[in-house]
């Protein structure tokens, strides 16, 4: 029997050195919203969308000043004006999420949502009554997705269904490494807000595993709906040089520095995976997890009946 850790490491190293095609898919006339669009993967994906003829690209960001700087960077590099908009959202604040969704309801259409924003920290903190990583990466992310779905499912004025809308959740290969001990709890989200049970060193990876469970569960429900179809998928950009580790202790960043220098993709290379996932409008990737442009199954070792309980709790 294959050693799962060796298999994971083999895939990881193979993935990091694979060459990803430069995006060439057309997003002509599309309206696209990217959370965390002011930096890293989100910024570079937004830059591609503008270059690929999107009609509107919304950078949903916490800091409007940084968002405006990102907008200027995109306009300078693409020589395209009047496409990028900057909207505010704070995923630590449910009311901010609801406000963004309400604002989006006034859009003429919404074709693509890239749920890219997230945090990685080993520091325990509560936001309201939930641990901060779970609130941002899971609860607020999927609250926003659910709130945006009605707009994405609208028909156009002529009553014709346009190209199938897409929701892309930015995931991580790290979901395979977490023990996710909370999955054994009677109430999973209660366990996730209990500091005594928390292993913050793997909390980010746990949040990414829960994301995958929710992607699959929501995709299944959407496929059974009588409303216009929406493709919901998840994508791993691989190990990338972004600001994700900004809340990681300095010592840890120094120790991982050589690995990042040798193995990590730059943000533009990683963003190509997001653009590829966003272009998949034929339904084939619905509920799927993508890595290096390939579809993969979810981590089988965690795909127990508790996955259903996790989704039901949400």
Swiss-Prot record:
Pathway annotation from the record: Secondary metabolite biosynthesis
Keyword set, alphabetical order: NADP, Oxidoreductase
Binding site for NADP(+): 41, 66, 90, 116, 204, 208
Gene induction: Expression is positively regulated by the aspercryptin cluser-specific transcription factor atnN.
Superkingdom assignment: Eukaryota
Result of knocking out the encoding gene: Abolishes the production of aspercryptin.
Pfam families the record matches: adh_short
Active site: 171, 204, 208
Top-level class of the enzyme under EC nomenclature: oxidoreductase
Molecular function via GO: oxidoreductase activity
EC numbers: 1.1.1.-
Protein family (similarity comment): Belongs to the short-chain dehydrogenases/reductases (SDR) family.
Function per UniProt: Short chain dehydrogenase; part of the gene cluster that mediates the biosynthesis of aspercryptins, linear lipopeptides built from six amino acids including 2 highly unusual and nonproteogenic amino acids, 2-amino-octanoic acid (2aoa) and 2-amino-dodecanol (2adol). The core structure of aspercryptins is as follows: Ser/Ala-Thr-Ile/Val-2aoa-Asn-2adol. The first step of aspercryptin biosynthesis is the generation of the fatty acid precursors, octanoic and dodecanoic acids, by the FAS subunits atnF and atnM.
Name of the protein in question: Short chain dehydrogenase atnD
């Amino acid at each position: 029997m294959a050693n799962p850790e060796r298999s994971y490491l083999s895939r990881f190293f193979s993935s990091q050195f694979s060459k990803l095609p430069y995006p060439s898919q057309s997003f002509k006339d599309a309206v696209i919203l990217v959370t965390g669009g002011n930096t890293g993967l989100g910024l570079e994906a937004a830059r591609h969308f503008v270059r690929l003829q999107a009609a509107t690209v919304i950078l949903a960001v916490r800091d409007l000043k940084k968002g405006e700087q990102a907008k200027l960077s995109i306009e300078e590099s693409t020589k395209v004006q009047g496409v990028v908009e900057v909207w505010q959202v704070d995923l630590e604040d449910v009311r901010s999420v609801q406000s963004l969704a309400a604002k989006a309801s006034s859009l003429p259409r919404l074709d693509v949502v890239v749920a890219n924003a997230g945090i990685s920290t080993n520091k325990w903190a509560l936001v309201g009554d939930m641990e901060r990583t779970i609130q941002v990466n899971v609860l607020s992310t999927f609250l926003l997705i659910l709130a945006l779905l009605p707009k994405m499912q609208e028909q156009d004025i002529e009553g014709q269904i346009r190209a199938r809308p897409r929701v892309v959740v930015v995931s991580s290969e790290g979901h395979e490494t977490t023990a996710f001990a909370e999955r054994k709890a009677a109430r999973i989200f209660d366990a996730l807000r209990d500091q005594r049970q928390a292993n913050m060193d793997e909390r980010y990876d746990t949040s990414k595993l829960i994301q995958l469970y929710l992607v699959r569960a929501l995709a299944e429900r959407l496929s059974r709906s009588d409303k216009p179809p929406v493709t919901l998928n998840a994508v791993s950009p691989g190990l990338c040089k972004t600001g994700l580790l900004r809340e990681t202790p300095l010592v840890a960043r120094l120790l991982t520095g050589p690995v990042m220098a040798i193995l990590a993709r730059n943000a533009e290379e990683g963003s190509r995976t997001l653009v590829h996932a966003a272009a998949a409008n034929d339904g084939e990737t619905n509920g799927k997890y993508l890595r290096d442009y390939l579809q993969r199954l979810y981590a089988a070792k965690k795909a127990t009946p508790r996955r259903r309980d996790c989704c039901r709790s949400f």
